[in-house]
């Protein structure tokens, strides 16, 4: 059956069927190949796209701007909107929907991007919220397909760290939809929400996926095709929480030893970035000097190893985001 996503918003992979996700991945592969061959499209020619950011970003902004421009769109970047302050989300959505053909939102609440989509009248794309990160997952799956050389349904992906965060949940949603084996690996005190686990396990009955939580590193990583992690602390959080968080998560740091425990020399290391993997950032140095905390979630050796595909992931943000825009707002 043909897939038609015209006019659809892209808020979470939970809204999409496996066939629709497959369509977006296939389109991403195609657009990337054309880009490499110097062939740019015009699917968004004459279209206007607005990027609405509450949270800063390097990859998301660049991916949307480059992807839209390469398909012929004009892009506006907004960081100083009065949305939710002097103007309601509903009113902002209606105004932007009159001027733009697509709206990207990167911010805090999932309810905000959902409210925008409800009232805008044009496709709204989730560039990240505290609850989800669907565009990142498309890039991750594209990268896995490029490097693992087998179907997603045969992939075992282990996310290690704080398994309650948006990346863990977003990967879980995608894995459940695409029939993958997903393991959330971390301390029991940072276990995913039980309701979300049950919801994903229900999806899995239809797709053949396996979704599970483990606190045992040796058992969880055995046979893994992918080890994935994310930063442990987010700026803006209460610093008094950091020592306990780091203590809890240090056993789940991605090390060469952990990679070796997979028993698979080709296990991929993945990370959505930014990463604390060395001491070459002000934040990492500050945490070390001022609080005596090593917040590095991955060893530098692993981050820079041949198993690491983190910069392929970063590039693939553009190709997959371009695919989402073309599929939903293109001509």
From Swiss-Prot:
The subcellular location is: Cytoplasm
Positions of L-ornithine binding: 166, 230, 234-235
Task: State a single Gene Ontology molecular function.
Answer: amino acid binding
Record Pfam families: OTCace, OTCace_N
Q: Identify the keywords attached in UniProt to this record, alphabetized.
A: Arginine metabolism, Cytoplasm, Transferase
Binding residues for carbamoyl phosphate: 57-60, 82, 106, 133-136, 272-273, 317
- Mostly located where? cytoplasm
Q: Annotated pathway, please? A: Amino-acid degradation; L-arginine degradation via ADI pathway; carbamoyl phosphate from L-arginine: step 2/2
Instruction: State the disulfide connectivity.
Output: none
What are the EC numbers? 2.1.3.3
What are its GO cellular component terms? cytoplasm
Biological process (GO) annotations held by this record are:
arginine biosynthetic process via ornithine; arginine catabolic process to ornithine; citrulline biosynthetic process
- What is this enzyme's class at the first EC digit? transferase
Q: Which PANTHER family match?
A: ORNITHINE CARBAMOYLTRANSFERASE, ORNITHINE CARBAMOYLTRANSFERASE, MITOCHONDRIAL
Q: Which family does it belong to?
A: Belongs to the aspartate/ornithine carbamoyltransferase superfamily. OTCase family.
What does the function comment of this entry state? Reversibly catalyzes the transfer of the carbamoyl group from carbamoyl phosphate (CP) to the N(epsilon) atom of ornithine (ORN) to produce L-citrulline.
Under NCBIfam families, the record lists: orni_carb_tr, PRK04284.1
The protein here is known as Ornithine carbamoyltransferase
Q: Which organism is it from?
A: Clostridium perfringens (strain SM101 / Type A)
Quote the gene name from the UniProt entry. arcB
């Amino acid at each position: 059956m043909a897939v038609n996503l015209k006019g659809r918003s892209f808020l979470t992979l939970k809204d999409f069927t496996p066939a629709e996700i497959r369509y977006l991945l296939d389109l991403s592969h195609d657009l990337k190949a054309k880009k490499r061959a110097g062939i740019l499209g015009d699917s968004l020619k004459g279209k206007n796209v607005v990027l609405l950011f509450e949270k800063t970003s390097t990859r998301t902004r660049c991916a949307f701007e480059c992807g839209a421009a390469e398909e012929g769109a004009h892009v506006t970047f907004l960081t100083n909107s009065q949305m939710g302050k002097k103007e309601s989300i509903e009113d902002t959505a209606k105004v932007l929907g009159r001027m733009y053909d697509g709206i990207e939102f990167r911010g805090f609440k999932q309810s905000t991007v959902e409210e925008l989509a409800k009232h805008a009248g044009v496709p709204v794309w989730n560039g990240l919220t505290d609850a989800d990160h669907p565009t990142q997952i498309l890039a991750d799956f594209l990268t896995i397909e490029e490097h693992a050389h087998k179907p997603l349904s045969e992939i075992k992906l282990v996310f290690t760290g704080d398994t309650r965060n948006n990346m863990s949940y977003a990967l879980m949603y995608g894995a459940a939809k695409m029939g993958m084996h997903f393991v959330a690996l971390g301390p029991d005190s940072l276990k995913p929400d039980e309701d979300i686990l049950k919801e994903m396990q229900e999806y899995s009955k239809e797709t053949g996926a396996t979704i599970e939580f483990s606190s045992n590193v040796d058992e969880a990583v055995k046979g893994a095709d992918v080890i994935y992690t994310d930063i442990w602390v987010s700026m803006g959080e209460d610093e008094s929480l950091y020592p306990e968080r780091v203590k809890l998560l240090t056993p789940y740091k991605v090390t060469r030893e952990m990679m070796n425990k997979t028993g698979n020399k080709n296990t991929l290391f993945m990370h959505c970035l930014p990463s604390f993997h060395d001491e070459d950032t002000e934040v990492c140095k500050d945490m070390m000097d001022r609080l005596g905390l090593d917040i590095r979630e991955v060893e530098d050796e692993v981050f820079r190893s041949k198993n690491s595909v983190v910069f392929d992931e970063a590039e693939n943000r553009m190709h997959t985001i371009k695919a989402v825009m073309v599929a939903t707002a293109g001509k």
